[in-house]
């Protein structure tokens, strides 16, 4: 019996023997395709080839493409674990022809691979096929050339309500390449319910689609007209998990070797014994998508791809919780995943440490709110009477406890309860509206500025040039002219001003001509034109007028130093921390630079010092900052780093600094690294799970920062009557002295409190014959309060003591109950009741319990509540 890894390799070997180029699986993050959330089909990486926008050195290709369907149009998340064939992650085996072979060869290749004893050797009588209703060519190839009996060839027409809307007609979109397809089905046998495709019972599990062969032969125009393509192509896809299930003689994908191993390992880690539990299926599926997404550069976050990843991780963690997992478990599956994926696991293995760390951190973060969120959900579900959970509750779980909607839906599904999603959407929209109102943005010119043509950028070599005004925008509208005092956006035919991009701020400066001055405060790009944003301070401007465009050269220069320093920092981080470090965002201004990057753990002070030292070494090396224009493939072959999420054209600008840094970048840079002068890190911290941020200054700004630090040190030393060299020692002495005095003071407070014990006994009130002391004592630590309570219990013999103390703006609560009363009065119950009044919680033994709180203004109320409760319960 073939393993899944062997099947994957045999597919690639077969098509390689037929003259196909074996192409590596592309990233799960689609390159240069903003229309896709994740790679979800084998043809994604060849989309531009099919559209005629890209050419490859081969006309036949084959791949084993990793895919994710867990967001957007193709969203299988809610069904994963509950059906035999739904997954968030799967592998699509495919062969492709770019204007080479067509229907005859495509069908013959598929049949040979499936049925030949040399390859898969499936019984021919087990295979059924479908064709598009009018595709006589494909029908005849199957029937007359291949020899499939007519009764096992099914014509499928337009079964989705409109022309060419059919299971057997594929289209890339509303317009563009499209064509009929033929699908191959495997018959599992009459012991399983279900009918052949096109029958009323087609949704059963007896007949399973294993291969789809698409014939791209038309170009659909906007009016619906179908034009024949001059060079028809072929796009095929076969699910690796599905064909593995067929060859391994199982009916569910979750029973194939890969999943059996992952399920067994999950059960071992969490201590589960029932290997058929659906939660084990969910976790085994989710570790594949999560590990590969992280390996491909996705970081858990609250938006976009990162939020889909977070949703999948949290769903897996919740199912681990259902299985009884007591500690972080999800990341422990990564080594097993790498092992079972064989050759296809190499990308995860290369980044294994980072993948495991991010999964562990995300699980630990969610574990803090999971229990509280589930308690709230359980309580809400227990009160549901009409089978519908309110959208308000679902939104609170999302907003407060980090529960994605589909996780809440998962819990509800287990109890046959649905969610009022319309109410959830209303709450979400209301939150967006509040956020927009709070932001108080002015005019959004992104939706207003529409100008034909483009602005020619001259700023790489110039800071001043003559330019013609092609458009003016004022108060959100296109205008012909502007007057003094008006804030506007000026569009120029050409400009030396750099428009904000790649993290670098837009240039400032001014536009001028005879008697006219327009102060440019910022420059932004709107489509292909540059908008110069600012205020007219003298004269008037009109469309068609020529102006001098003059950039603030000093600000530009300082910005360029920071941008070049950012590249050096990126390279230094990767050298010292590891190649898992990739840029996640940046802000480059004239004042400072800010750099966000993937890093799962905190950076030590020693590492930070090493990073700073390395950057300064490369500055002193005085490398030339070299610029080259080349095609994207040549740039990558040269080792240039492409930034995650950036879209690049055919030609790219490559920035090289010696043998240390090479990146794709369109920004403004120093001429040599030595121009930067000095690099100084001023802050480093975490900004999100798995993402760190460094802020730094360079050049004169770095010198000014160091001068200010020196001034602070000198002033501090003067205050302590020390010098800078012995300042640390002086502060340590002062701290030691302060601690000693504080300890002596606390001792005096405790002594005074103990001496007051007899006064407390005298002031005890009787409630139904039981002595009760409920008092506020300020400035006393919890430890001292416990000593006092124990002493008073001995003095009273029988009674209840409840003390509240305010210390450093925090509330300390201690409750003691003598042993003869614990059957009726529990110290933990009473202290929790008091803690609720001061914004805290606590617990302990029936005879002694403690709590803390953050609302000292409510201490009197806590004492009163304790007295009232004791009056009621004694």
From Swiss-Prot:
SUPFAM superfamilies: Class II aaRS and biotin synthetases, Putative anticodon-binding domain of alanyl-tRNA synthetase (AlaRS), ThrRS/AlaRS common domain, Translation proteins. It is found in: Cytoplasm. The keyword Ligase applies. SMART domains: tRNA_SAD (SM00863). GO terms for biological process: alanyl-tRNA aminoacylation; negative regulation of DNA-templated transcription. Its cofactor is Zn(2+). It holds the Pfam family tRNA_SAD. Zn(2+) binds at residues 563, 567, 665, 669. Belongs to the class-II aminoacyl-tRNA synthetase family. Catalyzes the attachment of alanine to tRNA(Ala) in a two-step reaction: alanine is first activated by ATP to form Ala-AMP and then transferred to the acceptor end of tRNA(Ala). Also edits incorrectly charged Ser-tRNA(Ala) and Gly-tRNA(Ala) via its editing domain. NCBIfam families: alaS. This is Alanine--tRNA ligase. It comes from Haemophilus influenzae (strain 86-028NP).
């Amino acid at each position: 019996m073939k393993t899944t890894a062997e099947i994957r390799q045999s597919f690639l070997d077969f098509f390689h023997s037929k003259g196909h180029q074996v192409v590596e699986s592309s990233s799960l993050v689609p390159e240069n395709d903003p229309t896709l959330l994740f790679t979800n089909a084998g043809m994604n990486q060849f989309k531009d080839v099919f559209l005629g926008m890209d050419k490859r050195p081969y006309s036949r290709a084959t791949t084993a493409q990793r895919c994710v369907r867990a967001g957007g149009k193709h969203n299988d998340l809610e069904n994963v674990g509950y059906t035999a064939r739904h997954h968030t992650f799967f592998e699509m085996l495919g062969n492709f022809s770019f204007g080479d072979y067509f229907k005859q060869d495509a069908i013959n290749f598929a049949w040979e691979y499936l049925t030949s004893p040399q390859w898969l050797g499936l019984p021919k009588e087990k295979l059924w096929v479908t064709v598009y209703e009018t595709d006589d060519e494909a029908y005849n190839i199957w029937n007359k050339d291949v020899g499939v009996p007519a009764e096992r060839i099914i014509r499928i027409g337009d079964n989705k309500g409109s022309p060419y809307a059919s299971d057997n007609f594929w289209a890339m979109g509303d317009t563009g390449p499209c064509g009929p397809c033929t699908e191959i089905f495997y018959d599992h046998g009459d012991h399983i319910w279900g009918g052949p495709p096109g029958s009323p019972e087609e949704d059963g599990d007896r007949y399973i689609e294993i291969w789809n062969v698409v014939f791209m032969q038309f170009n659909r125009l906007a009016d619906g007209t179908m034009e024949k393509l001059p060079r028809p192509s072929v796009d095929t896809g076969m699910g690796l998990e599905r064909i593995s299930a067929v060859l391994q003689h199982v009916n569910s994908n979750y029973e194939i070797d890969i999943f059996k191993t992952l399920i067994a390992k999950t059960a071992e880690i969490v201590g589960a014994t029932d290997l058929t539990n659906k939660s084990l299926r969910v976790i085994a599926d989710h570790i594949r998508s999560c590990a590969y997404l992280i390996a491909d550069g996705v970081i858990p976050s609250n938006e976009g791809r990162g939020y889909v990843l977070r949703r999948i991780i949290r769903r897996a963690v919740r199912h681990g919780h259902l299985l009884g997992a007591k500690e972080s478990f999800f990341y422990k599956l990564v080594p097993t995943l790498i092992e079972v994926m064989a050759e296809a696991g190499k990308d995860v293995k290369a980044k294994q440490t980072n993948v495991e760390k991010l999964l562990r951190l995300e699980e630990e973060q969610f574990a803090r709110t999971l229990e509280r969120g589930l308690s709230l959900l359980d309580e809400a579900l227990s009160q549901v009477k009409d089978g519908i959970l309110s959208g308000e509750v679902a939104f609170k779980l999302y907003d407060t406890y980090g529960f994605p909607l589909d996780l809440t839906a998962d819990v509800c599904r287990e109890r046959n309860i649905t969610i009022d999603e319309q109410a959830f959407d209303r709450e979400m929209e209301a939150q967006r509206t509040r956020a927009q109102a709070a932001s108080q943005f002015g005019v959004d010119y992104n939706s207003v500025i529409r100008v034909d043509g483009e602005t020619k950028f001259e700023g790489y070599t110039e800071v001043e040039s003559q330019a013609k005004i092609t458009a003016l925008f004022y108060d959100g509208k296109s205008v012909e002219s502007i007057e003094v005092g008006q804030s506007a956006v000026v569009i120029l035919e050409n400009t030396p001003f750099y428009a904000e991009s790649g993290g670098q701020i837009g240039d400032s400066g001014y536009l001028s001509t005879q008697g006219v001055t327009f102060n440019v405060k910022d420059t932004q790009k709107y489509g292909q034109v540059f908008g110069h944003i600012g205020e007219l301070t003298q004269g008037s401007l009109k469309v068609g007028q020529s102006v001098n465009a003059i950039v603030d050269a000093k600000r530009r220069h300082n910005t360029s130093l920071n941008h070049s320093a950012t590249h050096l920092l990126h390279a230094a981080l990767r050298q010292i921390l590891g190649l898992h470090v990739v840029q996640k965002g940046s802000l480059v201004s004239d004042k400072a630079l800010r750099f966000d990057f993937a890093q799962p753990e905190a950076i030590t002070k020693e590492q930070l010092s090493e990073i700073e030292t390395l950057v300064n070494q490369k500055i002193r090396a005085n490398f030339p900052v070299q610029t080259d224009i080349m095609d994207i493939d040549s740039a990558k072959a040269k080792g240039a780093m492409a930034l995650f999420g950036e879209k690049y054209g055919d030609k790219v600008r490559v920035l090289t600094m010696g043998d240390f840094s090479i990146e794709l970048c369109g920004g403004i840079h120093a001429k040599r690294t030595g121009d930067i002068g000095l690099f100084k890190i001023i802050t480093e911290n975490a900004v999100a799970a798995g993402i760190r941020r460094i802020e730094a200054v360079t050049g004169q700004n770095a010198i000014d920062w160091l001068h200010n630090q020196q001034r602070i040190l000198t002033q501090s030393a003067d205050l302590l009557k020390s010098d800078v060299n012995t300042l640390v020692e002086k502060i340590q002495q002062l701290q030691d002295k302060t601690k000693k005095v504080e300890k002596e003071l606390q001792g005096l407070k405790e002594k005074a409190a103990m001496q007051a014990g007899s006064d407390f006994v005298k002031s005890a009130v009787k409630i139904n014959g039981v002595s009760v002391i409920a008092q506020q004592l300020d400035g006393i630590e919890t430890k001292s309060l416990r000593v006092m309570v124990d002493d008073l219990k001995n003095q009273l013999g029988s009674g209840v003591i409840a003390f509240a103390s305010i210390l450093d703006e925090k509330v300390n609560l201690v409750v003691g109950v003598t042993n003869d009363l614990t059957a009726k009065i529990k110290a933990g119950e009473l202290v929790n009741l008091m803690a609720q009044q001061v914004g805290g919680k606590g617990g302990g033994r029936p005879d002694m319990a403690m709590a803390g709180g953050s609302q000292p203004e409510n201490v009197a109320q806590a004492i009163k509540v304790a007295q009232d409760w004791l009056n009621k319960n004694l």
